């Protein structure tokens, strides 16, 4: 017997490939996992912290939500980070980086520890047009 595709059973099995990274943040009382432009984004204290993308490069890794003034110090501490080629205000850790897993864990720990270089205030949502 064939099963219908896309049912509750199929949805239940879909796990984001970067879920293991944000799991370290889930026990924080302020943690919220949202969606933005086809990505998953972790909020702490209402701030955008880390964005998880699983599409084609350059949208296949982690974007660190930060201000441009913080780029140099974050790139020095987390060597594979670089400005995102499209969204240059944020830093990017490509999943293809040799140290992706190690750096991803360190970034999540820094976000959880409230590293002041990580996190931006979300922009206001535009109201829907009538």
Residue spans of the language-model regions?
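Residue-level detector of alpha-helix boundaries and kinks
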Residues: 6, 30-31, 96
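Short, structured beta-strand-loop surface elements
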Residues: 67-128
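Intrinsic disorder/low-complexity segments enriched in polar/charged and small flexible residues
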Residues: 22-24, 61, 92
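Short acidic, Pro/Gly- and aromatic-enriched capping/linker segments at domain boundaries
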Residues: 23-39
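Short Lys/Arg-rich cationic patches that frequently serve as NLS/NoLS or arginine-rich RNA/DNA-binding motifs
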Residues: 1-8, 122-130
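Short, conserved beta-strand/beta-arch hydrophobic-aromatic motifs that form part
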Residues: 35-86
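Short, compositionally biased leader-like segments
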Residues: 1-24
């Amino acid at each position: 017997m064939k099963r219908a595709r896309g049912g509750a059973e199929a949805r239940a099995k879909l796990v984001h490939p970067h879920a293991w990274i944000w799991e370290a943040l889930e026990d924080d009382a302020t943690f919220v996992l949202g969606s933005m432009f086809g990505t998953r984004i972790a909020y702490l204290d209402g701030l955008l912290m880390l964005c998880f993308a699983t599409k084609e490069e350059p949208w296949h890794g982690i974007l660190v939500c930060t201000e441009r003034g913080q780029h140099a110090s974050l790139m020095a501490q987390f060597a594979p980070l670089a400005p995102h080629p499209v969204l240059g205000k944020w830093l990017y850790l490509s999943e293809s980086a040799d140290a992706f897993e190690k750096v991803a864990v360190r970034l999540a720990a820094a976000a959880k520890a409230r590293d002041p270089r990580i996190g931006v205030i979300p922009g206001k949502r535009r109201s829907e047009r009538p």
